[in-house]
Amino acid sequence: MLSNGISEDDLFSFLSLHKKEDLDHRYILSSMCTLPHPVAVRAHCMFMETNLGDPGLFPGTAALERLLVERLGTLFHHKNAGGYATSGGTESNIQALRLAKALRPGSSPNVVLPESVHFSFKKACDLLSLEMRSVPLGTDRRIMADKAAELIDKNTICLVGVAGTTEYGMVDPIADLAKIAAQQDIFLHVDAAFGGMVIPFLPKPVPFDFALPGVTTLAVDPHKMGMSTIPAGVLLTREPDMLDALNIDTPYLTVKKGYTLGGTRPGAPMAGALAVLDYLGISGMKAVVAGCMKNTERLIAGMETRGIQPAASPDVNVATFVCDRVPEPWKVSWTRAGHLRIVCMPHVTADRIEAFLSDFGDMYA
């Protein structure tokens, strides 16, 4: 720490130098986060000092969190869902497995999940001492439900499906998994961190949420396609009081028990998430998702005309290609199998797709 403070001008000149080192969003094609919507930024600024971890001090902010859970529960066909605002998919997935373990205690617990799960499940299983049983994917890059059923035994505490895989943008056959979960009385967690704010707004959404009786919990990230400020995730539960199984005593706060993973929890991004939902509504979100899907289709078609084949036929706005290089200064990512991966987020507009295709064509000319 500095012995003496510096002037405000010098401070912000210093900060600006480092901010300039961050990448320009115009060239970011790999991220599942995006530029926040202006109403999210405005709402965030209104609630910057609030702490959801001590709701008795911020009852208005806590009421907005309950409203956000209700809004999303309704979107996912269960208005009376329980849940809370998390820091994102990683926390939501950890908490879902923590809940599953609490509800079915045992000496050798295991979790059955697809090979395509987000790396947060490795963290969760390490923290909770859970055995990971990975289910192979079919040729369509979705979990093979019949293989999942074969891996379930008396020590299985949770079955996991993904609605919008991080690498290829696929939606697992959640309906099939839900049937298995219901038949075997197994906790089913759906990781819809990405797809949760995409699938409901598609012309023909596939079933993946609480409309399926076997689904127990669901994770969704408003800071992805919901265009909230970061970090903004939500974990939803079928039963409104289900998370009480995780309660611990919090004697020196304004509430005496708590089940959240974080202690201090920012109200600002939660308010930003709710602001976007209420500002855009169903029709507005449909327009956003339609634009992203159109850009994804255009990107795939444009790459094919340049001789580059897609690695998958995605269910959401993630495009992958059999390709080993891209032009500078575009920032992309690569799947574990070595495929080029591009996420067509709201900031990846139609003109950016055309600019990328033009640069790509020049490089391969």
UniProtKB/Swiss-Prot annotation:
Record-listed N6-(pyridoxal phosphate)lysine modification sites: 224
Cofactors: pyridoxal 5'-phosphate
InterPro entries linked: GrpII_AminoAcid_Decarb, MfnA, PyrdxlP-dep_de-COase, PyrdxlP-dep_Trfase, PyrdxlP-dep_Trfase_major, PyrdxlP-dep_Trfase_small
Keyword Transcription regulation: no
Entry GO MF terms: aspartate 1-decarboxylase activity; pyridoxal phosphate binding; tyrosine decarboxylase activity
EC code: 4.1.1.11, 4.1.1.25
Keyword Signal: no
Keywords of this entry: Decarboxylase, Lyase, Pyridoxal phosphate
Top enzyme class: lyase
Catalytic activity: L-tyrosine + H(+) = tyramine + CO2; L-aspartate + H(+) = beta-alanine + CO2
The protein's annotated pathway: Cofactor biosynthesis; methanofuran biosynthesis; Cofactor biosynthesis; coenzyme A biosynthesis
Biological process terms in GO annotation: carboxylic acid metabolic process; coenzyme A biosynthetic process; methanofuran biosynthetic process
Function of the molecule: Catalyzes the decarboxylation of L-tyrosine to produce tyramine for methanofuran biosynthesis. Can also catalyze the decarboxylation of L-aspartate to produce beta-alanine for coenzyme A (CoA) biosynthesis.
UniProt cross-references to HAMAP family, sorted A to Z: MfnA_decarbox
Homology family: Belongs to the group II decarboxylase family. MfnA subfamily.
Protein's name in the database: Probable L-tyrosine/L-aspartate decarboxylase
Protein species of origin: Methanoregula boonei (strain DSM 21154 / JCM 14090 / 6A8)
